[in-house]
């Protein structure tokens, strides 16, 4: 009996030890699992911060490939050192940007007087004019009360609305990450959180557009009608000039700005829409300076000195404009969207077409660049300006056909 009782007691002790060991193993596994979950959350949070940091650093944003964490931190340190060396925390938000002896109002007046333009703020979500300085009256003949709260798209020329919407868009501010699936070796579409697709303060914008000009009886400034075209006769243009809207070419220079703090990702999804709406374009609008200071003489016997005003254009093999630099607006008066799709022969002087046709034929046959003679190019006000161009044809290596012609145009005054 005693032996049997002893064996039973030993079995009970072994069962208790087994249960203790099992519970100990279970607790260890739970601790490891909890530790793994904590580490995963920590890594996810770190990756989120690294992605946010890379979206704010211009050097990281310019890279096409996905950067590792150490590279992002290194570029962030370099960017902060550069900002510290510039003397302000931010080129637009720094508190030391304004001299201490000037008030904000005085600084604004000095900037507007120096630029001979007007300051305006437009919301990027709906194009609403949030602010406009009173100096707009000297440029557009409209008062501050006329434009404040109105839609900017109602003031713009209809053909310029699409271009302006591109300038208000902030989609290019999203991180450019190209991930490759290790199994299929195909690019993987990554859903970037909308909170990361915000505006980086200081994203610069510079473009030309046409704004509606309020007519006045004593208006002596140069105007243009939205119904005028180079292909219409002067009779139709004169008859419609009094009835159509008047527009003025405005050069807009500024930057995109977001004035609200970025919300955390764990907040409600409906708050993302409010975050994207709180962004705006802060810009100064002014009349672009006229490069031309004299009219072109009837003959080109005496060649003037070259003026280093260059603009680039790209043409099809037939001579149609596929692209033109914005600097051309300062020279010829046409906006890029007005001249694209038209042939450059429409703007050449009749007496220069024969020589330019020979240059056109030559550039289609030789791989070297071809320099044209000094020729006359028709501007928007129907006057002529002297240009000289270097044409070079780009041939597709696969089809041996000419894809386009690159032109470097120099202004002669």
Curated annotation (Swiss-Prot):
Chain positions of site Interaction with E-box DNA: 35, 38-39, 43
Disruption phenotype: Cyc mutants don't display PER and TIM cycling, and are completely arrhythmic.
Start and end residues of each bHLH domain: 30-83
Swiss-Prot/TrEMBL GO biological process terms: behavioral response to cocaine; circadian regulation of gene expression; circadian regulation of heart rate; circadian rhythm; eclosion rhythm; locomotor rhythm; positive regulation of DNA-templated transcription; positive regulation of transcription by RNA polymerase II
Acidic residues bias: start-end ranges: 8-19
Region listing for Disordered, in residue ranges: 1-43, 219-242
Composition-biased stretches (Basic and acidic residues): 20-41
Transmembrane segments: none
PROSITE patterns: BHLH, PAS
MF (Gene Ontology): DNA binding; DNA-binding transcription factor activity, RNA polymerase II-specific; protein heterodimerization activity; RNA polymerase II cis-regulatory region sequence-specific DNA binding
UniProt xrefs under PANTHER family: CIRCADIAN PROTEIN CLOCK/ARNT/BMAL/PAS (PTHR23042)
Protein name per UniProt: Protein cycle
